[in-house]
Amino acid sequence: MNIAKQIAEELKIKVWQVEAVMELIDEGCTIPFIARYRKEKHGSLNDEQLRNLDERLTYLRNLEERKETVLASIEEQGKLTEELKQQILAAQTQVLLEDLYRPYRPKRRTRATIAKEKGLEGLANQILLQLLGHSVEEEAKQYLDEEKEVTTVEQAISGALDILAEAIADEADYRTAIRKTTMQKGSLVSTAKNAEEKTVYENYYDFSTVLSKVSGYQTLAINRGEKEKILTVKIEAPEDDILRYLRKKVIVKENEYTTPYLEEMIADSYKRLIAPAIEREIRNELTETAEDGAIRVFGKNLEQLLMQPPIAGKVVLGWDPAFRTGCKLAVVDETGKVLDTIVVFPTEPQNKVAETKRIVKAMIEKYNISLISVGNGTASRESELVIVDMLKELNRPVQYIITNEAGASVYSASKLATEEFPNFDVGQRSAVSIARRLQDPLAELVKIDPKSIGVGQYQHDMNQKKLSEALGNVVEDCVNNVGVDLNTASASLLEYVSGVSKAIAKNIVTYREENGRFKSRRELLKVAKLGPKAYEQCAGFLRITGGKNPLDATSVHPESYEVATKLLEMLGYQLEDIAGGLTGLSLMAKDTKKLAEQVGIGEITLKDIIRELEKPGRDPRDEMPKPILRSDVLEMKDLKEGMILKGTVRNVIDFGAFVDIGVHQDGLVHISKLTDKKFVKHPLDVVSVGDVVDVKVLQVDMQKKRIQLSMIL
């Protein structure tokens, strides 16, 4: 198999592009580095294309390794024909490869292997040849052997049919055809074990749909219902069609003696061996497809959450709401440094509202707080009412925002949080996290396991290794897309930088603590375990403001410093001029093709350098929608059908999007209500987490706490 050609066809890109990326990966380059600094080499493939390429490359290389193992095993058995070898080499999927290997794979003792041990293979061959001129019973008498425990004709025939049933089940072409027919004509069926029981799975109590039309969220919901022993699930295959197909393949000539036995054997082979295996394979395939889709959605949601714009330059009060144990508050300054913490008790059972207002007002005055970040967990609504009431009594403009606190409790109890705030309890740490999430969502959220951030669907039911890897890639892409301040970044943030491992991240922080601020990127080479390759991979993503070289504060890679300096000189600038940005530089450097030749660099790279010099250290998050800050409260009972509201998309799932409209119960915009202009294949084609949108209230169900919305575009 030509792996590069295969991937190029699948991803609809050029073979040379795939070969270039394969070479870079084999040299130890990371995807963020390849995406940003090797565009010339691979023709400007984007992050997503590169991730898909890397994933397929890993799969196909593993497949090639498995082929070598399979070929060696069959050759060792002396059963490898040229035809079989070519079939194995041509196999493009793991499933097809394993189908080809099935007849030769070492087996545990089966009914067929036991029958072979009893010497019944000859009888099986006679039946399969369909040439007998006398009864099968007569033929079977020759195979009776008391020593081998074949004492009756029935035993001999039964054993022979077992051998044939397994041979039929192991035939790769048959399995491929049956799998295809089942997928095309079969149905996924689920029923309730107890139809009277009220559960969230009632939609699946009497459910049936064609396999080819099962959606990802249906597969995952049914799987969970089965796991919780609420649903019984099966695949209903077109059995008559399949048995007809097998009969046509196996019974090549009608024989009054052998045909009845072959028909019996075919039915047994299908029902006992083929059908259960195909059902397992198809359900695994449905699950894998559903998981891949859910992971993709989770990744997109996570990306949007991490790329929320920072609210810079504000002193923030983080508010972690609670009832019995009190609300934990933490004040953090513009840089995220903790200035103060306190516990207040405005909620049940103590209801110290007046005292809470007095304390918080004093904190607002003392620290010049302009924003309150309230966690959306238990007692959030009660806290919000107290805050809104208090804000009306202030003589200064202070706003609040309800912040998704998912994962804050996980972080606050973690080893990392303990190291960061050894003298704080978990509530205080959580309040700090809730405040910092507004100031720099990316820097704070990287401290939390992405699976705990709360923007996924059925994440606990998925392949955890695959999920963690995919989400880790998303975080890595976001961190490198934004860039990291080398002198302020935590080890948690640094470890996602291209080329930086956990150990190197800790070593960078240690070096900083022992030697003070980094003054240049070159200084990174003094960090323990950070060698030339790691430096090449990470340097461009690590920024130094106020360092020796102004280029260290940009995304220009050190390997291009000479070119950047030469370019500036040609256009009449000096290095020092780039500090505030060189607006209009691209207009001065119109003929990029000619300029690229003059400075000795590729045109694509030159354009990137010019773009960066125009606005050094640009933050892509600045282009994202800003969060909605509030000063008044809206309650669910205030909602009326037809109301137009502004909200923030909190989560996107296969069947719609949940929108926060400020009433502590997210409303659902069903996929059919996202737009009236076109068919929507997936909600992510229309909205993303963090989008600020206008919605209309369609229906409010106070009893079930459900709000149905439609999008206004």
Q: Where on the chain are the PLM-derived regions?
A:
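Long, highly charged, low-complexity intrinsically disordered interaction regions
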Residues: 3, 55, 62-79, 89, ...
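Short flexible coil/turn linkers enriched for glycine and charged/polar residues
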Residues: 14-15, 27-28, 94, 108, ...
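Short, ordered loop/turn segments at secondary-structure junctions
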Residues: 37-39, 238, 321, 334-335, ...
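Duplex nucleic acid-engaging cores and interfaces of nucleic-acid transaction enzymes
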Residues: 49-52, 59, 63-73, 77-318, ...
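Structured, non-catalytic alpha/beta "coupling" segments that mediate domain-domain communication
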Residues: 73, 87, 97-100, 225-238, ...
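A glycine-rich phosphate-binding loop feature that marks nucleotide/adenosyl-phosphate handling sites
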Residues: 180-188, 319-323, 378-379, 403-410, ...
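Single-stranded RNA-binding regions, centering on S1/OB-family and related RNA-binding modules
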Residues: 547-713
